[in-house]
């Protein structure tokens, strides 16, 4: 964690360990990406589980991976995003009148420029809540997703509303509620530590209770842990 902001893969919780391992393979560059027609990473699951935050962080983590500054013998889940960020990511908040034409034109514009700015030699595109585009607009994105030098990071709360052609072009990463409340304890402890609250002041059992109440929402979990930290004299990090 960088203050209260996730800055590595291990700052997120995954309901499917196989899916997290896929991301680890990509970030460690053991699994080529894009490869075999898979040009996107689609994060799907319920609200508040960190999908948008992770979608915007993944390009940063890939830049660290391709820069060669991280010792790949160390767990890649701990690999941090570069500080300060130099990554130029084009972010599209789907819905609200955003058209597929606008997205396609932007992708083509980036794809035609030379040289590519990033260490990965790819351009990065985030499509947040892609299911909010109508099905025709989604289908028209299949072609730009096939352009060279492009990586796409998509999120959705409703996987069944995403065009099958887009789904087929993506690695699917499930982000739903983790069934074991104990899995949330390290995250809560990290937040409290960043607030200056001593170890054990808020017990593991209390953190598990907060996790159960949050029902999978990292937004609610983080909020309630912060409130506990403030109640015990902690301060928000600068």
What is the meaning of each model-derived region?
Residues 163-196, 205:
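Conserved AAA+ ATPase core "coupling" helix
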Residues 1-46, 108-117:
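Pre-Walker A (pre-P-loop) alpha-helix and adjacent loop at the N terminus of AAA/AAA+ ATPase modules
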Residues 20, 82-122:
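Short glycine-rich substrate-engagement loop in P-loop NTPases that contacts/grips substrate
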Residues 32-91:
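Walker A/P-loop
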Residues 47-49, 95-100, 131-133, 147, ...:
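Conserved nucleotide-binding/hydrolysis micro-motifs of P-loop NTPases
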Residues 108-116, 126-168:
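Conserved catalytic/switch belt of AAA+ P-loop NTPases
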Residues 204, 212-226:
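The conserved phosphate-sensing helix
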Residues 225-238:
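Conserved C-terminal helix/linker of AAA+ ATPases
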């Amino acid at each position: 964690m960088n203050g209260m902001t996730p800055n590595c893969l291990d700052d997120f919780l995954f309901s499917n360990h196989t899916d997290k391992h896929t991301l680890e393979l990509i970030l460690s560059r053991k699994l080529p990406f894009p490869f075999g027609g898979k040009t996107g990473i689609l994060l799907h699951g319920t609200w508040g589980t960190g999908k948008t935050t992770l979608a915007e962080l993944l390009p940063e983590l890939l830049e660290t991976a391709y820069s060669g500054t991280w010792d790949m013998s160390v767990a890649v889940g701990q690999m941090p995003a570069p500080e300060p960020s130099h990554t130029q990511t084009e972010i599209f908040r789907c819905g609200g009148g955003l058209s597929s034409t606008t997205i396609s034109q932007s992708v083509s514009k980036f794809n035609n420029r030379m040289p590519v700015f990033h260490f990965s030699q790819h351009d990065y595109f985030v499509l947040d809540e892609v299911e909010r585009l109508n099905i025709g607009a989604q289908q028209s994105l299949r072609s730009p997703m096939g352009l060279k030098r492009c990586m796409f990071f998509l999120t959705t709360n409703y996987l069944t509303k995403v065009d099958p052609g887009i789904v087929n072009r993506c690695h699917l990463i499930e982000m739903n509620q983790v069934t074991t409340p104990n899995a949330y304890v390290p995250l809560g402890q990290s937040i409290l530590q960043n607030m200056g609250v001593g170890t054990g002041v808020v017990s593991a059992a209390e953190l598990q209770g907060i996790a159960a109440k949050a029902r999978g929402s990292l937004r609610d979990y983080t909020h309630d842990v912060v409130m506990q930290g403030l109640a015990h004299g902690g301060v928000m990090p600068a």
